[in-house]
């Protein structure tokens, strides 16, 4: 017996990139009905398989009567599409939570969710132990440090911009050190994990981030260290890259699947 199984639901995906495509396939395998929101002329339309409906506008998607919206299209979608979803009273699960480094945007989305009966759901995606960070967020002197360590294939363009040959990199290169707010703004497609830590814990300014490209890395590694009056936490997660997008971890789409099914489940682990 699968204690997490839920009855078929109607899910609207914003976008159809690598993560959304993996999530769509997993949802459909479990019997859920999927529609994707893609503007007319989007090249992603060519990748959408039979059995997945396509809507060009949110008005068109509304005829599908989605029970949950899942954003998997990047910061621009969070700014431009998610507000309209929330104003319609729809629950929205956001994967590109790095967009919320913009405090005004976060306040706007939270306000829309509260005033229209929707819900703003923030995905943890590739990172574990956020429950510990949330529990310690009120502690005096909470410090949180995060390091992202990925192989050169994940940072090829960034390495070339710095004058490095990704295929000939001999030693680790630190691409970034700073706050989670700076990281989310600098790498909108890559550091949603840093934003998740900041939102769960001490905030974007107090969460420290380092981004390292390592030729010896065999996967996408996330290391987190948190310290407070309650104790010390240190965790390292080595995720395999997505087969279709080396910048992202393969587990992300499965994390979103788990979040979708937990949302509808009568039993919820908090």
Q: Residues of each region from the PLM?
A:
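Active-site-lining helix/loop region of Rossmann-like oxidoreductase modules
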Residues: 14, 22, 120-121, 126-270
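Short acidic low-complexity segments
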Residues: 52-64
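Rossmann-fold NAD(P)-binding glycine/threonine-rich loop
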Residues: 97-118
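NAD(P)-binding Rossmann-fold cofactor-contacting core
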Residues: 30-48
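Hydrophobic/small residue at the entry helix of a nucleotide-binding pocket
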Residues: 19
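ADP-ribose/adenylate-binding Rossmann-like module
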Residues: 74, 85-104
């Amino acid at each position: 017996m699968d204690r997490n199984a839920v009855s078929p639901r109607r899910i609207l995906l914003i976008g159809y990139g690598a993560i959304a495509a993996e999530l769509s396939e997993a949802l459909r395998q479990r019997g859920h009905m999927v529609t994707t929101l893609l503007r007319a002329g989007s090249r992603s339309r060519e990748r959408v398989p039979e059995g997945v409906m396509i809507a060009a506008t949110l008005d068109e998607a509304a005829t599908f009567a989605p029970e949950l919206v899942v954003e998997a299209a990047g910061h621009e979608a969070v700014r431009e599409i998610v507000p309209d979803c929330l104003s319609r009273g729809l629950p929205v699960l956001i994967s590109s939570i790095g967009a919320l480094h913009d405090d005004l945007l976060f306040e706007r989305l939270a306000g829309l969710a509260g005033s229209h009966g929707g819900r703003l759901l923030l995905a943890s995606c590739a990172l574990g132990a956020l429950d510990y960070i949330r529990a310690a967020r009120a502690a005096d002197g909470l410090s949180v440090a995060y390091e992202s360590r990925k192989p050169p294939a994940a940072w090829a363009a960034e390495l070339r911009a710095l004058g490095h040959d990704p295929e000939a990199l001999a030693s680790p290169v630190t691409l970034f050190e700073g706050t989670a707010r700076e990281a989310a703004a600098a790498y909108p497609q890559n550091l949603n994990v840093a934003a998740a830590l900041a939102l769960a814990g001490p905030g974007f300014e107090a969460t420290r981030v380092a981004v390292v490209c390592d030729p010896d890395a065999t996967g996408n590694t996330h290391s987190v260290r948190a310290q407070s009056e309650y104790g010390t936490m240190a965790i390292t997660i080595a995720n395999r890259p997505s087969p279709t997008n080396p910048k992202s971890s393969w587990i992300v789409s499965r994390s979103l699947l788990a979040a979708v099914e937990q949302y509808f489940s009568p039993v919820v682990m908090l």
